[in-house]
């Protein structure tokens, strides 16, 4: 959520930033917010005048009573003033509700580093690692490799649940589990993150706090009876871990890593990468989340992105890093990098991680602040997160990049200790 004071003082600048964001955002709502804000402030002035008058009149009552004078008119006036104040309070509550409704639907302001552009084709490659994998045979897609090796079963998952679900079997299940352990071990032992195992369901307030709601409710799986939501990413519970709290400045940055299952309806994605493991309704992911001071956040974003890159390098999977343009930035991020791995069957790079700085956008929604010391004024933290990385897509990338002509798949060396010393899946 944006700072209302910032909108008040820089409305034209904010309109321009949102106009260029590529989401076809209706900037006239900024004028609506300003109008409501002005109305609210005018009413607050009137309320203060009325309260001052009521206090003044009220202070005269004891003196007049002591003098034996009739105070019925003054008491009646006090009652009228109180009723008038109560009416204004009701009006203020309605205005606040309208302002909140609009503010929750205004996207974040892009950082000046974000390139112009409308679609993912306008994203800018920052760097790449290793050349795309070449084969002297016709490579297969990961869904065929997995099915042939009997380690992925899409057909039976479709029978048991529906489309875009998967059974991992045998060494496929072990590969998935090995990646989870390897990612968690790397980020905790080498990169200094504290591991969190979060709930897989959160309440509506948590989804609002990280920006999934109200805009993306159709993409979420909801438990209707309790108004709980299955998490689309561990970002939601881990960020909300400190909702409505004031952190200590000397504890920042806080760095957490969390493994979780993730659940997404992927509404509107029909026909887009829906075969195989790339776009599932349920998938596993290891998430990196940071809470920082404002002046630390962009340096910490670079570190977080490098942490995610480390596991891809150690796995030996070719990848690139792209800076996301304004039109592809999404609702909550101020600046975002995507890590994309090479997928031979697609003959292109496929996103495996998004690393974002939200600045104070989520912190304002979730009311997460910090104080430098006991006497300091609380300030909003900056929140960051990134996949470290998506497990299913990593399995897909390993199957495709490490496939052999005989149909087997070589296991990356870094995973072999987790795979019982096995060198290949046959």
Swiss-Prot record:
Question: Superkingdom, according to UniProt?
Answer: Bacteria
Disulphide-bonded residues = none
Q: Which SUPFAM superfamilies match?
A: Class II aaRS and biotin synthetases, tRNA-binding arm
Annotated ATP binding lies at 264-266, 351-354
Instruction: Name the Gene Ontology molecular function terms of this record.
Output: ATP binding; catalytic activity, acting on a protein; serine-tRNA ligase activity; transferase activity
The pathway to which it is assigned is: Aminoacyl-tRNA biosynthesis; selenocysteinyl-tRNA(Sec) biosynthesis; L-seryl-tRNA(Sec) from L-serine and tRNA(Sec): step 1/1
Catalytic activity from the UniProt record: tRNA(Ser) + L-serine + ATP = L-seryl-tRNA(Ser) + AMP + diphosphate + H(+); tRNA(Sec) + L-serine + ATP = L-seryl-tRNA(Sec) + AMP + diphosphate + H(+)
Q: Which UniProt keywords apply?
A: Aminoacyl-tRNA synthetase, ATP-binding, Cytoplasm, Ligase, Nucleotide-binding, Protein biosynthesis
Q: Which Gene3D superfamilies match?
A: Bira Bifunctional Protein, Domain 2 (3.30.930.10), Serine-tRNA synthetase, tRNA binding domain (1.10.287.40)
Q: Which Pfam families match?
A: Seryl_tRNA_N, tRNA-synt_2b
GO CC terms in record = cytoplasm
Q: Which residues bind L-serine?
A: 233-235, 287, 387
What is one GO biological process annotated to this record? Answer: selenocysteine biosynthetic process
Q: What is its main location?
A: cytoplasm
Per UniProt, subcellular location reads as:
Cytoplasm
Question: What PANTHER family does the annotation carry?
Answer: SERINE--TRNA LIGASE, SERYL-TRNA SYNTHETASE
Question: Which family is annotated?
Answer: Belongs to the class-II aminoacyl-tRNA synthetase family. Type-1 seryl-tRNA synthetase subfamily.
Q: How does it assemble?
A: Homodimer. The tRNA molecule binds across the dimer.
Comment field on protein domains: Consists of two distinct domains, a catalytic core and a N-terminal extension that is involved in tRNA binding.
Entry protein name: Serine--tRNA ligase
């Amino acid at each position: 959520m944006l700072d209302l004071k910032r909108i008040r003082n820089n409305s034209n600048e904010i309109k321009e930033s949102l106009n260029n964001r590529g989401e076809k955002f209706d900037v006239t709502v900024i004028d609506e917010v300003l109008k409501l804000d002005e109305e609210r402030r005018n009413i607050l002035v009137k309320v203060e005048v009325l309260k001052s008058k009521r206090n003044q009149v009220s202070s005269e009552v004891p003196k007049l009573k002591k003098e034996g004078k009739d105070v019925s008119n003054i008491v009646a006036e006090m009652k009228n003033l109180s009723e008038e104040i109560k009416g204004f309070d009701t009006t203020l509550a309605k205005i606040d509700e309208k302002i909140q409704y609009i503010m929750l639907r205004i996207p974040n302001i892009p950082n000046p580093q974000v390139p112009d552009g409308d679609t993912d084709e306008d994203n800018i490659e920052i760097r790449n690692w290793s050349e795309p994998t070449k084969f002297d045979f016709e490579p297969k897609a990961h869904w065929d490799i997995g099915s042939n090796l009997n380690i992925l079963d899409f057909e039976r998952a479709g029978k048991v649940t529906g489309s875009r679900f998967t059974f991992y079997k045998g060494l496929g299940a072990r590969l998935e589990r090995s990646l989870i352990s390897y990612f968690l071990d790397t980020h905790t032992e080498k990169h200094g993150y504290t591991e969190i195992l979060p709930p897989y369901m959160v309440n509506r307030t948590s989804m609002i706090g990280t920006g999934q709601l109200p805009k993306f409710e159709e993409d979420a799986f909801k438990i209707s009876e309790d108004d709980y939501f299955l998490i689309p990413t561990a970002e939601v519970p881990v960020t909300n871990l400190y909702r409505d709290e004031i952190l200590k400045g000397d504890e920042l940055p806080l760095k957490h890593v969390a493994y979780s299952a993730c659940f997404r309806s992927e509404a509107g994605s029909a026909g887009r990468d829906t075969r195989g493991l790339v776009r599932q309704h349920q998938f596993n992911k290891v998430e990196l989340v940071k809470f920082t001071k404002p002046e630390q956040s962009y340096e910490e974003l670079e570190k977080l992105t490098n942490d995610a890159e480390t596991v891809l390098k150690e796995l030996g999977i070719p990848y690139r890093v792209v800076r996301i343009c304004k039109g592809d930035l999404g609702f909550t991020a101020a600046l975002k990098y995507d890590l994309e791995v090479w997928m031979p069957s697609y003959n292109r790079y496929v996103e495996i991680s998004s690393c974002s700085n939200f600045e104070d956008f989520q912190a304002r929604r979730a009311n997460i602040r910090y104080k430098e010391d006991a006497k300091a004024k609380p300030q909003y933290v900056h929140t960051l997160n990134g996949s470290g990385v998506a497990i299913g897509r990593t399995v897909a990338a390993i199957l495709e990049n490490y496939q052999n002509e005989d149909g087997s798949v070589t296991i990356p060396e870094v995973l072999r200790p987790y795979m019982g010393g096995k060198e290949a899946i046959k």
